[in-house]
Every structure is written in C-alpha cells, then in structure tokens.
C-alpha cells in the first residue's frame, strides 16, 4: 500500500516525512512486531533520502548493518564504514614478480605471503555496454548498488570472461597500472594501503610495491565497498554487525524529481508557479503478517499478536 505527500517546500516535506515515520512506528508497535529503522538506497524510485523498516529474521531477503555501540543502522546497499589503514610504509619501487598459475586474490595472498589487505583486486563490469575497470583493496568486496549509483547507469552486471579477454585484459592478472581505454573506478581503501600487490596484465606475473595514486590514477574515486561484519562504524568507530531481515515499510523524500518530470506545480501567494515537493510512503500489509509469523512463532506454531490475530 502506498501513500504520497505534497508540500510547498523542503521544510514541509520534512514535517510530512517525520510524521509518516512516527505513524509507521506506532502501527508496527500496535501490530506487536519489532522493527529497526535503517538508512536505505532509494533505488529506481529515486529521491535524496529514504529509510526502511526492517523486521529482523534469519529468513529475510535483506541484509542490514547495525553498530554495536551507537544507533547507526543501514541497509547493506547503503551502509558505510571507517576504513582501517595498513601500517605506514615508505613507498618502494614497483617490481614484476613471476606468479605462475596464480589467478585469485586468495592464491596471490598465499603465494606472496601477505594478507589480502596488501593486494589490489580488479573487478570488471559491463555498465550500459561499457566495460568498467574497478580497483579495490583485496580484503574488501564491491557493493554493486554503490557502483551503479556512482556510474549513474541503468544496467550493471559482471563482465564475462570473454568480454574481459576481448578488451585485451589478462584475467587473474589484470592491472590498473598503465591501463588505457577504460573508465577506472577506485575505492578510497587503496589510499590506506602501501606497497600493494596487483596484476601486471601479463600472464604469470604480478606487480609488487604498487601505490595509489603514485602508480595509477582513477576516473572516479568513490566509496564502492560493501560494509561487512567486523568493520568499523563510520560514526563512533564501534564494531558493525550484520543481520537478515524483511522490509515491511519504506519511506522516501522524493523532492521535486517527479514533479519536474510531470510538470506538477502550484501557484504561491505571489502567483509564482513552483514545483510540488513530494514524499512517497510504502507499507507491506502482507509482509507484516509474514513477518509476525517469522518473529513470533514458537515450537508449537504461530503466535499471532492480538491486534492482527484472525480470531481470539
């Protein structure tokens, strides 16, 4: 079920938005279920701010990230974390190293005798039919939602091995050093590593003592890393925990994005036409029931809260 708000300015939208958040909280409390409010990606709906109401359950389709020391909470599509710097080292000259048969980060880490945090991971994507080179520290994973938002594309997928090969890159030893003809997206984690090991774009070889941005630069440097359990909270430095959950509500500050495309406006007191400022609010009626069953059942079966029970 969806609802919308229409206001004359951003301040009015914030009031409407906050009222709906409070209304949702009270609704779920009356339903007898416990929810967590998390920062969320706006997705295809768009807008500049959105929050999800998540019912925590191991069977949930979403992953959320919570801090164990403060109130930070976010869907993993949106979650951020504080990057931990590798110990400071003086930058050394790059060297080619023979690495026969080494194709993965774990294999490279074992072969070189270094942690994955001392490597550079190269990942290739097709973004609206353009091959994108992504470079991130080897101990981290790419958050594809963040990457898609950074690129502002409608279609994003992993490039196939054939596409990587056709682009002139060596799978398992692709290098951001000296690469040409691609947009290179770098995660800021590379600035927190020193003398890293990266591909050499030559079969059976890698480069050691690679430093960013000394040895290569990026077209875009932006957070594209997936926040995971054990990472540091971006607010307080506490430890992040991950949980599965079901989304049962989602609220958005749409702003004027839809009123501009629909040419929806109003006349103010001075007779000046201005864009309507919109909000959007979704609630999953069926998901509330499913969530209650997941959260409240015991060994004897379903334990419905009285307010949503089909019978006494």
Label the model's feature ranges.
Residues 1-288, 295, 299-306:
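Extended, low-hydrophobicity, polar/charged segments
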Residues 307-312:
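Short, intrinsically disordered, charge-balanced linker/junction segments flanking boundaries
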């Amino acid at each position: 079920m969806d609802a919308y708000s229409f206001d004359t300015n951003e301040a009015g939208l914030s009031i409407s938005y906050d009222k709906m958040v409070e209304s949702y909280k009270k609704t779920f409390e009356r339903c007898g279920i416990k929810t967590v409010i998390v920062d969320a990606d706006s997705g295809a709906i768009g807008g500049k701010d959105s929050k999800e109401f998540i019912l925590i359950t191991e069977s949930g389709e979403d992953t959320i990230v919570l801090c164990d020391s403060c109130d930070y909470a976010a869907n993993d599509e949106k979650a951020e974390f504080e990057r931990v710097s590798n110990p400071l080292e003086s930058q050394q000259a790059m060297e080619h190293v023979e690495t026969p048969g080494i194709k993965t980060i774990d294999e490279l880490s074992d072969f070189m005798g270094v942690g994955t945090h001392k490597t550079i991971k190269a990942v290739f994507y097709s973004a609206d039919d353009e091959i994108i080179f992504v470079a991130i520290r080897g101990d981290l994973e790419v958050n594809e939602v963040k990457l898609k938002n950074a690129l502002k594309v409608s279609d994003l997928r992993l490039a196939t091995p054939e596409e990587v090969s056709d682009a002139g890159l060596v799978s398992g030893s692709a290098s951001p050093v000296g690469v040409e003809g691609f947009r290179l997206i770098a995660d800021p984690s590379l600035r927190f590593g020193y003398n890293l090991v990266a591909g050499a774009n030559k079969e059976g070889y890698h480069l050691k003592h690679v430093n960013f941005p000394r040895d290569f630069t990026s077209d875009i440097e932006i957070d594209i890393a997936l926040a995971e359990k054990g990472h540091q909270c971006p607010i307080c430095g506490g430890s992040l925990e991950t949980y599965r959950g079901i989304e049962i509500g989602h609220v958005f500050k749409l702003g004027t994005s839809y009123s501009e495309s629909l040419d929806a406006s109003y006349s103010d007191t001075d007779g000046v036409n201005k864009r309507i400022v919109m909000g959007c609010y979704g609630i999953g009626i069926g998901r509330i029931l499913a969530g209650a069953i997941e959260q409240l059942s015991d060994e004897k079966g379903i334990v419905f809260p009285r307010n949503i029970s089909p019978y006494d």
